[in-house]
Regions:
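Conserved PLP-binding active-site segment in aminotransferase class I/II-type PLP enzymes
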Residues: 1-21
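N-terminal small-domain helix-loop-helix segment of the aminotransferase-like
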Residues: 14-109
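Conserved core of the PLP fold type I
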Residues: 67-220
Length: 226
């Protein structure tokens, strides 16, 4: 990352800059799933009739799936075929990503776990985290209590719509104090359920890009749980 995307590297937290995928059992296990067609000695698992052993009372509710697809250990970052299909969907729905260097998506154990990973990878003590003033407590726990980030909010609504100007003004304000800013874009907003109009979405993109062009390092987090 430091060589191919130095700007991104500087946005990572101290922990994020040191994280790596260990080349032990996780890597070897992933390679074995792909290449070990006869023997796989990387994992201990009880087999019966060339299939993982399981309880009938569990499989009775999962007949739509093959036992080999649901009972063995799942890869830590998600099943490769799911991740590839997910990336293909992203590229289809976002043509502007074509030709860009992006990573394969990874799976997480629900929303707060995903936010926690983002927080660990990008948020240092004292980093500003900008979000609307309508939010649930898991944001405070994840970005403030755990990562020691500074939560700063703006009024969610203005004149019956999303407060785009308030968002941009707040990012610019804290960006002058510290040039790295984490922006949480949670749409549909939880708990209000509000989704920006197309015009509001375009104004958000334009405003954030304009601030980025001025030198503010913006980490835009799309929290789209729905």
């Amino acid at each position: 990352i430091e060589e191919q995307a130095p700007a991104v590297f500087t946005m990572l937290s101290k922990l994020g800059q040191e994280l790596y995928m260990p080349k032990g059992i996780l890597t070897q296990g992933a390679e074995a799933k792909e290449k070990a067609h006869k023997f796989n000695a990387t994992i201990g698992i009880a087999m019966e009739n060339n299939s993982p052993m399981y309880l009938d009372c569990i499989y009775d509710n999962l007949k739509a799936f093959k036992p080999t697809d649901i009972f063995p250990y799942a890869p830590s970052s998600g099943k490769p075929e799911l991740r590839k299909a997910w990336q293909a969907k992203m590229l289809k729905e976002n043509p502007s990503l074509k030709g860009k260097l992006i990573s394969m998506p990874v799976t997480v154990n629900a929303l707060t776990h995903g936010l926690s990973i983002v927080s660990q990878m990008f948020c240092n003590e004292g980093d500003y985290v900008v979000m609307p003033d309508k939010f649930w407590g898991n944001y405070r726990l994840t970005f403030s209590t755990i990562s020691d980030g500074v939560l700063t909010t703006f009024p969610t609504f203005h004149e019956g719509g999303f407060n785009v100007d308030g968002l941009i003004k707040k990012v610019e304000e804290v960006g002058k104090l510290k040039p790295k800013v984490i922006v949480i874009l949670n749409f549909p907003n939880n708990p209000t359920g509000y989704t920006p109009t197309l015009d509001e979405a375009n104004r958000i993109v334009y405003g954030l890009r304009n601030l980025a062009d001025k030198g503010i390092k913006i980490i835009s987090v799309a929290d789209d749980d729905y």
